[in-house]
Swiss-Prot record:
NCBIfam families: PRK00029.1. It comes from Nitrobacter hamburgensis (strain DSM 10229 / NCIMB 13809 / X14). The gene is ydiU. Mg(2+) binds at residues 265, 274. Belongs to the SELO family. This is Protein nucleotidyltransferase YdiU. The lineage of its organism: Bacteria, Pseudomonadati, Pseudomonadota, Alphaproteobacteria, Hyphomicrobiales. The active site is at 264 (proton acceptor). Pfam families: SelO. Its cofactor is Mg(2+); Mn(2+). GO terms for molecular function: AMPylase activity; ATP binding; magnesium ion binding. It is an enzyme of class 2 (transferase).
């Protein structure tokens, strides 16, 4: 399979331009998008720029902070080299297929190549209506902009594949939701915005020609090694399955709940995308749901791996016309590929869980040991993040159970498990300090707790941004103790719990 032609004829990069756009998706056929101009903002004001990410993308942060930069980040000015488009896609939403969704309040400005030669999208979220808006106003309230900035950057600091946030801007205008709210625009960075739903869009129309164009483009952009395989499209599918199996495991190891895991919110590049009603658990429970629209718990915490597998099955269905020779052979190949998801997920999950438990060697019974701890945590309302952080200290001290015991409603439930855990630790020759160091690197002390995010949003809506900035700074170092910010590691006090989160559309 030759390289995708769109990459060979991408727009030439202007090294003198403040943002060095090098666009490829806008070279695809126009069935893939709508060319559109962002809506303007009445009185744009910069809220935050991600300096480190800007430098990685070869963009001068000082430009982004200038009036000219803010004009670009708000959609008021189209930068040289930018080719704004709204991408088309379809998707299963809570199991029901919608043949046309698309970017209803997001506009892809273009692509840049970072200092390591990796390609990224720059997208404005909250930048106005497109033909995919479906009656919406195309705008974003400030709250969802702040939530995505906080959580996506926290996920990146945790080492979890994710879209990023380059900047947040106040528009100086209000939007009408359940009440009048200040408006904002987020500049999102992603390795691409290719979704399972992008493939479903063309498959649903029987447009095999453009489906092949899309698959070839995705291979070139994300998995170029698949080009040389005997069946490049199956190799591509296998790579996506493996990437999403690893991603699901990473979510489960930190207590992250996506909240709206539709096929249009499943990125084939293996990144977490679309943070609308997402949340991190405080007290552990496998059936935890935060999203206000997930009334039946389809996307509950424990269901996430199975949902990803379901989404991958829908993805396989779109690729059948491209895979192997003949429908039966293609179905057989796809089934063999999706069957590997369970083992790939389980391998990534138990490998990560072993590190959280201080185990370096693979032994029979480790998965059961992990499952038993989680069951006891659920029964005793133990905080997910604090339990694993406290285990780090317990592992370093044979008599150091007190910190973990205090997190359990019935401390004896932990004692029973801890006896077996310490027996398992004794089977490995490893210093206590080496074990503790490894565990600390897998168990953060700081996560974006829901009540902290809500407090930052409420203050921001009132025009005060200190809580937002401080929370972003603390979460940039989630594995460091940062004693001066110890309160950020604490669970919500009674009355502070956030029971529901909202999409923010």
């Amino acid at each position: 399979m030759p390289p995708s032609a769109e990459f060979a004829r991408s727009t030439s990069t202007n090294e003198a331009a403040p943002i060095r756009f090098d666009n490829t998706y806008a070279r695809l056929p126009e069935a893939f998008y709508q060319r559109v101009e962002p809506a303007t903002a009445a009185a744009p004001r910069l809220l935050r720029v991600n300096d480190a990410l800007a430098r990685q993308l070869r963009i001068d942060p000082q430009f982004l902070e200038s009036p000219e930069g803010v004009a670009v980040l708000s959609g008021n000015v189209i930068a040289p080299g930018s080719e704004p488009i709204a991408q088309a896609y379809a998707g299963h939403q809570f199991g029901d297929f919608v043949p046309q969704l698309g970017d209803g309040r997001a506009i892809l400005l273009g692509e840049v190549v970072d200092v390591a030669g990796k390609r990224y999208d720059l997208q404005l979220k909250g930048s106005g209506r497109t033909r995919f808006s479906r009656g919406g106003d195309g705008r974003a309230a400030l709250g969802p902009v702040i939530r995505e900035y906080i959580v996506s950057e926290a996920m990146a600091a945790l080492g979890i594949p994710t879209t990023r946030s380059l900047a947040a801007v106040l528009t100086g205008e209000n939007v009408m939701r359940e009440r009048v709210l200040p408006g904002g625009v987020l500049t999102r960075v992603a390795s691409s915005h290719l979704r399972v739903g992008t493939f479903q869009y063309f498959a649903a129309r029987g447009d095999i020609e453009n489906l092949r164009v899309l698959a070839d483009y995705a291979i070139e952009r994300h998995y170029p090694e698949a080009r040389s395989a005997e069946d490049p499209y199956r190799a591509f599918y296998d790579a996506v399955v493996a990437a999403l199996a690893r991603l699901a495991a990473r979510w489960m190891l930190v207590g992250f709940i996506h909240g709206v895991l539709n096929t249009d919110n499943t990125a084939i590049g293996g990144e977490t995308i679309d943070y609308g009603p997402c949340a991190f658990m405080d007290a552990y429970h496998p059936d935890k749901v935060f999203s206000s629209i997930d009334q039946f718990g389809r996307y509950a915490f424990a269901n996430q791996p199975a949902v990803i597998r379901w989404n991958l099955t829908r993805f396989a269905e779109t690729l059948l016309p491209l895979m192997a020779d003949g429908t039966d052979k293609a179905i057989e190949a796809a089934n063999a590929s999706i069957a590997r998801f369970k083992d790939q997920y389980q391998d990534a999950y138990i490998r990560g869980f072993r590190q959280k438990l201080g185990l370096a060697l693979e032994m029979e019974g480790d998965l059961e040991l992990a499952a038993d701890l989680l069951a006891r945590m659920a029964e005793n309302q133990a905080d997910f993040t604090l339990t694993f952080r406290a285990l780090c200290e317990a592992a370093a001290d044979p008599k150091g159970n007190a910190g973990v015991r205090a997190l359990f409603a019935n401390p004896s439930a932990f004692d029973e498990w801890a006896a077996r855990w310490r027996e398992r630790l004794s089977l490995e020759e490893r210093s206590a300090e080496a074990r503790r160091t490894a565990m600390l690197a897998a168990s953060p002390v700081f996560i974006p707790r829901n009540h902290r995010i809500e407090a930052a949003i409420q203050d921001a809506e009132a025009g005060h941004f200190d809580k937002f900035h401080e929370l972003v700074e603390v979460l940039a170092h989630p594995y460091d103790d940062q004693p001066q910010f110890a309160d950020y590691g604490k669970p919500p006090a009674p009355g502070e719990e956030v029971q529901q989160t909202f999409c923010g559309t």
